[in-house]
C-alpha cells in the first residue's frame, strides 16, 4: 500500500467498548473502511462506493438485487482517527492483559485495505512519535503507563517483567525477525504455556521506547514487496508477542501472573488478476491465500462446534492457525479488525471479508486468569478459600440472559437453593459470631479472675505461714485456755469457715467450671433425649435415688457417731480450699474424659446397633419373603390335598361300584352251580329257560378273582403312591433349595441397597462436615489475613513516613551546608566586586565625558533626522493614497475581469451551442451565424482592448509605487546610517559596562561549573552505588526466583505423587467394586441358571405327575367300574338267596382298603397340620428372636447405665472418703489446738488486720492498674481512630489517583485526536492548495497565456497567496511547538 494512501486513513472512534463485555468472552469484531484514494476514479471518470455506514454497529453492502446489512461490535467510517481505534479496540485488551488474561489483536482484510496502517501507522515517518501512529505503538504506551501506575500504587510489593518476541510466517515457514540469521523454526505445545515457537528470541524491555526499538528492528527484517495494488505489500504474517509477568508479594504468599499480548498483522488476500503477480510473488500469494483459507475453515468449524455440532477443528493445517489456537476459541480475549476497501472494484474481497468477520463474531473463547500462587501451605489455603468465596459471590450475582427456558428453570431452582443455603450460612455465621463474642467475654472474665486468684494465693500463703506459727505456739502453750474462751474461739472460726465457703462458692473459676458443666449438661441432655437412653436414665434415676437415700442414712449415722466435735480452723483454711479446687479440677477432667469416652462408646454402640439393625432388617426381609413363599406353598398344598382327597373319594366310590357289580363268567358256570335234585329239576329248567341271561350276569364272582383284582389294584395304588411320595419328596427338596436361594438373593439385594444408602449418607455427612470446617477455616483465615494486611499497610505507611522524614532531614542539612558555603562565597565575591566597582567608577567618569561629546553630535543628527522624517511621512501619505486608489482600481478591474471571464464562458457555451446549431442547420442559418460570430468577435476584441488598457494603468500605478518605494528606501537608508552612528557610541558604552559583568559572570560560570562537576561526581558515585545495589537486588531476585522455582517444582512433584496415589487408590477401589459386582453378577447368574434348571425339573416332574395322575385316573375309572359292578352284585344278593354270596374275606379286604385310604387322608391332614404348625413355629421363633434382640438392646442400655452409675458412685465414694479424711484431720488438729485458742485468736485478729491492710494496698494497686489500662485503652482508641483516618485518606487518594488517571487518559486521547485533526486539516489544505494551483494554471491557460499583463497580475496574486499560506504555516508550526511542549509537561 502506498504511503500516501496510508496517511489518509482514519480510525474508529470509541463509544462503548472500554468496559468488558458481560456476554462471556466472545471475539470482538471491528470493521474499518479505508477512505477512497484520489486515484479511485475509473477510466471513464466514474467513482462508486459499494459500502455505506448505517450506524456505529451496522453497515450496508450495496449488492444486486438486494443490499446486505451486517452488524458488528463497531463500524468505523472513513474519517475516524487512530486514537479512536486504539481506545475502542485495544484499551480493554491491554487492561485485561494487566489483569492476567491473554489478549490478541489482529487485522484481517485484502491487500491494500489498510491493515499495516491500522496496526503500525504511516511507513514514511517515525511511527512512535507520529500523530497517526497505529495500534501497536499506542498499545506500548498504554501498557507501560499502566505498569508505572501499578508500581506507584503498590511500591516495592509488586514488580513487572516484560519480554518481547517478533516472528513471521512466510511461505508456511516460521522465522524470527529479531534474529536475521534464523532459519525455519518449529512450533511446540506445552500443557501450561500452550503453543510456542522453539528458539525464538525474547528480549526484556522496560519502557515503551525500548519495545518500539525491538519492533522497528524486527520490522526492518520483514518481507515486503510491491504489487500493482500496493506499493508496500506485506508478504508474510507478522506476530509481535509481549509476555507480561507480574509478581505481587502479600505477607508470605507470592502471586505470579503471566499474560501474553499478541499483536498480529496478517498479510492480505490477493487475486492474481488484480495484482498481476508472477514468479515469486505468485508463490507468496498462493501461500498467503492458503493460510487465510485455513483460518476461515477453523472459524467455520468453531462456529459449528459452538452450535452443538461434532466437528474437527483443523488447527494444524496451517502454521498460522496452530500459532493462534488459543486466540481462536481458547484461553484469550481476542479482537479482530476487519479492514475493507469501499471501492466497487473490490466488491468480491469486501464481501468475503465481511462474511469472515460475521462468522468470527460467533466464536466464544474461554479466557482465564493465568495466575500461580506460591508460599506456605496456610497462605495458599487462605488464598484458595478467598478465591472460592469470590467465585461463589460472582456466581450468585450473575445470570446469563440469553439462555433457554429449561436452563432458566434450572438456574432459578439453583438460585433458590443457593439463597436458602446462603440464609442458613448467614444464620450460622451470626450464631458463630455471638458465640465467639461470648467466648471472648468469658476469656476476659477468666483472665481477670485468674489475676484475682493469684492475689488470693499470696494472701493464702501468708495465712499458711501464720497458721504454722500458731500451731507451734499452740504446741508450746497447750492447756492454757478456759472452756468459754475455747467456745468463743471456735464460734469465730466457724464464722470464718462460713465466709470462706461463701467465697469458694462464688469463686470465678468455679463459675467457669459451672458454665462448662452447664454446656456439658446440655450435650448430655441432647443425648438423653433418645428413647432407649431415656428408659435407661429413668431406671438409673430410681437406682440413684435409692443409693443416695442409703448413703445419706450412712453419712448421718457416721456424723452422729462422731459426736459434737467442733470444726478445727486448719481444716477450713486455704490449703484445704485449694486441695478441693484441685480435686474439683481433677474431677472435672475425669468427667470430661469419661464423657468423651462415653460419647465414643455411644457412637460405637450406635454404629454396632445400626449395623445389627441393618443385618436384622435384611434377615427380616428375607424371612418375610420366605414366609410369603411358604404361605403360597401352603395354599398350593392345601389345594393339592383337597384335589387329592376329592380324587380319592371318587376312586373309593368307583371301586365300591366295581366291586358290587357282577362280571361275565362263562367258563365258571358249571363249576359254581351245584347239582340239583330231580324234584326241582323242572323248576330249575324253567327258571333257566326263562332268564338265561340273568343267570349268567347274576353269577357271583369267585373270591379268588376278586382277591386277585383287589391285590392288583392295591399294588398299582401302592406303586403310584410310592412314586408320588418320591416325587413329592424331590419336589419338597427342590422347593426348599429354591427358597434358600431366593432368601440369599433377597438378603444380598437388601444388603447391597442398605450399603449404598449408608455410603451415600456417610458421604453426604462427610461432605457437609468438610464444607463446614472449610467455611470456618476460610472465615478465620480471612479475618487473620485482613488484620495482617491492615497491619502491613500501616507498617508500610509508617516506614514511608519515616523515610520521608529522613529524606527531609537530609535535604535540610544539605540546604544548610549549601547556604553556609554560598554565604562564604558571597562575602568573597562582594569584596572582589567592591574593588572592581572602584575601577569601573573611574572608567565610567571617563566614558561620561566622551558620552557628553557624543550627545551633542547626536542632537545635531537628530534634528536632521526629524526633518527627513517629516518629509518622508508626507511623501508616504501621498504614495499610500495613490496605492489605495490603485488597489481600488485593481479590485474593480478584478471584478470586471471576473465578469469578463464569466461572459467569456457564457459566450463560449453560446458559441458551442451556435456551432451545434450551425452543424444542424447549416444550410438555413449560415449567414446569420457568421454575422453573430463577427459581432461576438468584435465585442471580444473590444473587451480585450479594454482589459489591455486597464492592465496598462495597473502597470503604470505599479511603476509609480515602485518609485515611491525606492524613495522611501533611500530615506530609510539615510536614517539607518544615522542610527548606526548613535548605536556605535552606545555600544561602546555598553561594552565597557558589560565587560565587568562578563568577568563576574565568568567567575560565576566557573563556580557553577565547579558545582556541576561536584554534583556530577556525587551523582556518578550515587549511580554507581545504585547500580551495585541494583545488581545485588537482581542477584537476590535471581536467587529468590531459583528458590521459588525449586519450591514450585517440589510442590508440583508432591502434587503429582499425591494425584498418582489418589489415582492408584481410586483404581484399586474401582477394581474391588468391579470384582464385587462381577461376583454378585456371577452369583445371580448361577442362581438364575439353577432356578431355570429347577423350573425345568419341576416342569418335567409336573409332566410325569400329570401322566401318573392320568394313569391313576384310568385306574380309578376301572376301579370305579368294578366297584359299581360290585355294588350291583351286593344289591342283587338278597333277591337271589340260592346264588352264592360274597366271601367274608373280600369284605375285610375292602374294609382294609378303605381304612388305608382314610389313613392316607388323615396323613394328608396331619401333614397339613404339621406344615401349619411349622409356619406358626417359625413365626414364633421370629418373634422370639425379635424379642431377644430388643431384650439384648435393653440389656446393653442397662449395662451402659449401670457402668455410668457405678462410675458415678465410685466417684462419690472417693469424694466422701476424701471429705472423711479431711474431717478426721480437722478433728485431730482441733483436739490439739484447744488449749491455745485465745492466743490463736489474738494472732488471728492481728493477721486479719494485716490482711486487710494488704488487701487495701492491693485494691489501690488494682485501681492504679485500671487507670493505666484506661489510659492505654484511650491511647489505643486514638491510634485506631488515627489509623482509620489514615486509611480513609489513603482510600481517598486512591480514588483521586484513579480519577486523575482516567482524566489524564481522556485528555491524552483528546489531544491525540486534535493532533490527527490538525494533520488532516493540513493535508486538506495541501490538497486545496494543489487544486488552487491546478485551477490557476487552467485559468492562466484559458485566459492569460497570450497577455503579458495578465501574467504579471497572475504572478502578483500567486505571491500574495504564497505569503498568506506561509504566514498560516508559521502559525500552525508555532501552535504545534506549543502543543508538544504542553504534552511534555
From Swiss-Prot:
Residues found modified as Phosphoserine: 1139, 1167
Residues bound to ATP: 109-116
Biased composition (Polar residues): 10-21, 1228-1241
Subcellular location: Cytoplasm; Cytoplasm, Cytoskeleton, Spindle
Protein's name in the database: Kinesin-like protein KIF15
Keyword Coiled coil: yes
Family to which this protein belongs: Belongs to the TRAFAC class myosin-kinesin ATPase superfamily. Kinesin family. KLP2 subfamily.
Molecular-function GO term, any one: ATP binding
Region span, Disordered: 1-24, 1222-1243
Amino acid at each position: 500500500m502506498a504511503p500516501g494512501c496510508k496517511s489518509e486513513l482514519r480510525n474508529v472512534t470509541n463509544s462503548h467498548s472500554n468496559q468488558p463485555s458481560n456476554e462471556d468472552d466472545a471475539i470482538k469484531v471491528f470493521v474499518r473502511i479505508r477512505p477512497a484514494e484520489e486515484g479511485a476514479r475509473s477510466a471513464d471518470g466514474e467513482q462508486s462506493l459499494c459500502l455505506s455506514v448505517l450506524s456505529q454497529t451496522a453497515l450496508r453492502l450495496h449488492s444486486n438485487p438486494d443490499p446486505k446489512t451486517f452488524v458488528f461490535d463497531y463500524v468505523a467510517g472513513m474519517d475516524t482517527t487512530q486514537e479512536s481505534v486504539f481506545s475502542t479496540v485495544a484499551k480493554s485488551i491491554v487492561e485485561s492483559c494487566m489483569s492476567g488474561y491473554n489478549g490478541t489483536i489482529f487485522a484481517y482484510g485484502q491487500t491494500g485495505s489498510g491493515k499495516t496502517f491500522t496496526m503500525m501507522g504511516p511507513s514514511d515517518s517515525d511511527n512512535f512519535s507520529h500523530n497517526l501512529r497505529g495500534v501497536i505503538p499506542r498499545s506500548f504506551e498504554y501498557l507501560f503507563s499502566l505498569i508505572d501506575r501499578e508500581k506507584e500504587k503498590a511500591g516495592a510489593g509488586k514488580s513487572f517483567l516484560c519480554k518481547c518476541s517478533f516472528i513471521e510466517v512466510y511461505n508456511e515457514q516460521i522465522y524470527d525477525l529479531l534474529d536475521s540469521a534464523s532459519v525455519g523454526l518449529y512450533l511446540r505445545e506445552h500443557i501450561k504455556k500452550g503453543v510456542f515457537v522453539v528458539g525464538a528470541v525474547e528480549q526484556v524491555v522496560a519502557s515503551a521506547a525500548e519495545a518500539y526499538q525491538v519492533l522497528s528492528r524486527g520490522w526492518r527484517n520483514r518481507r515486503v514487496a510491491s504489487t500493482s495494488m500496493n506499493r508496500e505489500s506485506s508478504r508474510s504474517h507478522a506476530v509481535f508477542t509481549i509476555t507480561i509477568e507480574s509478581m505481587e508479594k502479600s505477607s508470605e504468599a507470592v502471586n505470579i501472573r503471566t499474560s501474553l499480548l499478541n499483536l498480529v498483522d496478517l498479510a492480505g488476500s490477493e487475486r492474481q488478476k488484480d495484482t498481476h503477480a508472477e514468479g515469486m510473488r505468485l508463490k507468496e500469494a498462493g501461500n498467503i491465500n492458503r493460510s487465510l483459507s485455513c483460518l476461515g475453515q477453523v472459524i467455520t468449524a468453531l462456529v459449528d462446534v459452538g452450535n452443538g455440532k461434532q466437528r474437527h477443528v483443523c488447527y494444524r493445517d496451517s502454521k498460522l492457525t496452530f500459532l493462534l489456537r488459543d486466540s481462536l476459541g481458547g484461553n484469550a480475549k481476542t479482537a479482530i479488525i476487519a479492514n475493507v476497501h469501499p471501492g466497487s472494484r473490490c466488491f468480491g474481497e469486501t464481501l468475503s471479508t465481511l462474511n469472515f468477520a460475521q462468522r468470527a463474531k460467533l466464536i466464544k473463547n474461554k479466557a482465564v486468569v493465568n495466575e500461580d500462587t506460591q508460599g506456605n501451605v496456610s497462605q495458599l489455603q487462605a488464598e484458595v478459600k478467598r478465591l472460592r468465596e469470590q467465585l461463589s459471590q460472582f456466581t450468585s450475582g450473575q445470570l446469563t440472559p440469553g439462555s433457554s427456558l429449561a436452563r432458566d428453570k434450572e438456574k432459578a431452582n439453583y438460585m433458590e437453593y443457593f439463597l436458602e443455603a446462603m440464609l442458613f450460612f448467614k444464620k450460622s455465621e451470626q450464631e458463630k459470631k455471638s458465640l465467639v463474642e461470648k467466648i471472648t467475654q468469658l476469656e476476659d472474665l477468666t483472665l481477670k479472675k485468674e489475676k484475682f486468684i493469684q492475689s488470693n494465693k499470696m494472701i493464702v500463703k501468708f495465712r499458711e505461714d501464720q497458721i504454722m506459727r500458731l500451731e507451734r505456739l499452740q504446741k508450746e502453750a497447750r492447756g492454757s485456755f478456759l472452756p468459754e474462751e475455747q467456745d468463743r474461739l471456735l464460734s469465730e472460726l466457724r464464722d470464718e469457715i462460713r465466709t470462706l465457703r461463701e467465697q469458694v462458692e462464688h469463686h470465678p473459676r468455679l463459675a467457669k467450671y459451672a458454665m462448662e458443666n452447664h454446656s456439658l449438661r446440655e450435650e448430655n441432655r441432647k443425648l438423653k433425649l433418645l428413647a432407649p437412653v431415656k428408659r435407661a436414665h429413668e431406671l438409673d434415676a430410681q437406682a440413684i435415688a435409692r443409693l443416695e437415700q442409703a448413703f445419706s442414712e450412712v453419712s448421718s449415722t457416721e456424723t452422729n457417731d462422731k459426736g459434737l466435735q467442733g470444726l478445727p480452723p486448719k481444716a477450713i483454711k486455704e490449703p484445704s480450699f485449694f486441695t478441693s479446687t484441685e480435686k474439683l479440677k481433677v474431677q472435672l477432667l475425669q468427667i470430661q474424659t469419661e464423657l468423651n469416652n462415653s460419647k465414643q462408646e455411644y457412637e460405637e454402640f450406635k454404629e454396632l446397633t445400626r449395623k445389627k439393625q441393618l443385618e436384622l432388617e435384611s434377615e427380616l426381609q428375607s424371612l418375610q419373603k420366605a414366609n410369603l413363599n411358604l404361605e403360597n406353598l401352603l395354599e398350593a398344598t392345601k389345594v393339592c390335598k383337597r384335589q387329592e382327597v376329592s380324587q380319592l373319594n371318587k376312586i373309593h366310590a368307583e371301586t365300591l361300584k366295581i366291586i358290587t357289580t357282577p362280571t361275565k363268567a362263562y367258563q365258571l358256570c358249571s363249576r359254581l352251580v351245584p347239582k340239583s335234585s330231580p324234584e326241582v329239576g323242572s323248576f330249575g329248567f324253567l327258571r333257566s329257560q326263562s332268564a338265561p341271561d340273568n343267570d349268567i350276569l347274576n353269577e357271583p364272582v369267585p373270591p379268588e378273582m376278586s382277591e386277585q383284582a383287589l391285590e392288583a389294584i392295591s399294588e398299582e395304588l401302592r406303586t403310584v403312591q410310592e412314586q408320588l411320595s418320591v416325587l413329592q419328596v424331590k419336589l419338597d427338596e427342590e422347593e426348599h433349595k429354591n427358597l434358600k436361594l431366593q432368601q440369599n438373593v433377597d438378603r444380598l439385594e437388601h444388603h447391597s441397597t442398605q450399603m449404598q444408602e449408608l455410603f451415600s449418607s456417610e458421604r453426604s455427612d462427610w461432605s457437609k462436615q468438610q464444607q463446614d470446617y472449610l467455611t470456618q477455616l476460610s472465615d478465620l483465615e480471612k479475618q487473620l489475613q485482613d488484620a495482617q494486611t491492615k497491619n502491613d499497610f500501616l507498617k508500610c505507611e509508617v516506614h514511608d513516613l519515616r523515610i520521608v522524614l529522613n529524606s527531609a532531614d537530609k535535604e535540610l542539612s544539605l540546604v544548610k551546608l549549601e547556604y553556609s558555603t554560598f554565604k562564604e562565597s558571597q562575602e568573597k565575591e562582594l569584596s572582589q566586586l567592591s574593588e572592581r566597582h572602584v575601577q569601573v567608577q573611574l572608567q565610567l567618569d571617563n566614558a561620561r565625558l566622551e558620552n557628553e561629546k557624543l550627545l551633542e553630535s547626536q542632537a545635531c543628527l537628530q534634528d536632521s533626522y526629524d526633518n527627513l522624517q517629516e518629509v518622508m511621512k508626507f511623501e508616504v501619505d501621498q504614495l499610500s493614497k495613490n496605492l489605495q486608489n490603485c488597489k481600488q482600481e485593481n479590485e474593480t478591474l478584478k471584478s470586471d475581469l471576473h465578469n469578463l471571464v464569466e461572459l467569456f464562458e457564457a459566450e463560449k457555451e453560446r458559441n458551442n451551442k451556435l456551432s451545434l446549431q450551425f452543424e444542424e442547420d447549416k444550410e438555413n442559418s449560415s449567414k446569420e451565424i457568421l454575422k453573430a460570430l463577427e459581432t461576438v468577435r468584435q465585442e471580444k476584441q473590444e473587451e480585450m482592448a479594454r482589459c489591455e488598457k486597464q492592465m496598462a494603468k495597473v502597470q503604470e500605478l505599479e511603476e509609480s509605487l515602485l518609485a515611491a518605494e525606492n524613495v522611501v528606501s533611500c530615506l530609510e537608508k539615510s536614517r539607518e546610517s544615522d542610527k548606526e552612528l548613535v548605536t556605535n557610541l552606545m555600544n561602546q558604552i555598553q561594552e565597557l559596562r558589560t565587560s565587568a559583568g562578563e568577568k563576574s559572570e565568568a567567575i560565576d560560570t566557573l563556580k557553577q561549573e565547579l558545582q556541576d562537576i561536584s554534583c556530577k561526581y556525587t551523582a556518578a558515585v550515587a549511580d554507581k552505588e545504585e547500580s551495585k545495589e541494583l545488581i545485588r537486588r537482581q542477584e537476590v531476585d535471581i536467587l529468590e526466583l531459583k528458590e521459588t522455582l525449586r519450591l514450585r517444582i517440589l510442590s508440583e512433584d508432591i502434587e503429582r505423587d499425591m494425584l498418582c496415589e489418589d489415582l492408584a487408590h481410586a483404581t484399586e477401589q474401582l477394581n474391588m467394586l468391579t470384582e464385587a459386582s462381577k461376583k454378585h453378577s456371577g452369583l445371580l447368574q448361577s442362581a438364575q441358571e439353577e432356578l431355570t434348571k429347577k423350573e425345568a425339573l419341576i416342569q418335567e416332574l409336573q409332566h410325569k405327575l400329570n401322566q401318573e395322575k392320568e394313569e391313576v385316573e384310568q385306574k380309578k375309572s376301572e376301579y370305579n367300574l368294578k366297584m359299581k359292578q360290585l355294588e350291583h352284585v351286593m344289591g342283587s344278593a338278597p333277591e337271589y338267596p340260592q346264588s352264592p354270596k360274597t366271601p367274608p374275606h373280600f369284605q375285610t379286604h375292602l374294609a382294609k382298603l378303605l381304612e388305608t385310604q382314610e389313613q392316607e387322608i388323615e396323613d394328608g391332614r396331619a401333614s397339613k397340620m404339621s406344615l401349619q404348625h411349622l409356619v406358626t413355629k417359625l413365626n414364633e421363633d421370629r418373634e422370639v428372636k425379635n424379642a431377644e434382640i430388643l431384650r439384648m438392646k435393653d440389656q446393653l442400655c442397662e449395662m451402659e447405665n449401670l457402668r455410668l452409675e457405678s462410675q458415678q458412685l465410685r466417684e462419690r465414694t472417693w469424694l466422701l472418703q476424701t471429705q472423711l479424711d479431711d474431717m478426721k484431720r480437722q478433728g485431730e488438729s482441733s483436739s490439739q489446738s484447744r488449749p491455745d485458742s485465745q492466743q490463736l485468736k489474738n494472732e488471728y485478729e492481728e493477721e486479719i488486720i494485716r490482711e486487710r491492710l494488704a488487701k487495701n494496698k492491693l485494691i489501690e494497686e488494682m485501681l492504679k492498674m485500671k487507670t493505666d489500662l484506661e489510659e492505654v485503652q484511650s491511647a489505643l482508641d486514638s491510634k485506631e481512630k488515627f489509623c482509620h483516618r489514615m486509611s480513609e485518606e489513603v482510600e481517598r487518594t486512591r480514588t483521586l489517583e484513579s480519577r486523575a488517571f482516567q482524566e489524564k487518559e481522556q485528555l491524552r486521547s483528546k489531544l491525540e485526536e486534535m493532533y490527527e485533526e490538525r494533520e488532516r486539516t493540513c493535508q486538506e489544505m495541501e490538497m486545496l492548495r494543489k487544486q488552487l494551483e491546478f485551477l490557476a494554471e487552467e485559468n492562466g491557460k484559458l485566459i492569460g497565456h497570450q497577455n503579458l499583463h495578465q501574467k504579471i497580475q497572475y504572478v502578483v496574486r500567486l505571491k500574495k497567496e504564497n505569503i498568506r499560506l506561509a504566514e498560516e504555516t508559521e502559525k500552525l508550526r508555532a501552535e504545534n511547538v506549543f502543543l508538544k511542549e504542553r504534552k511534555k509537561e
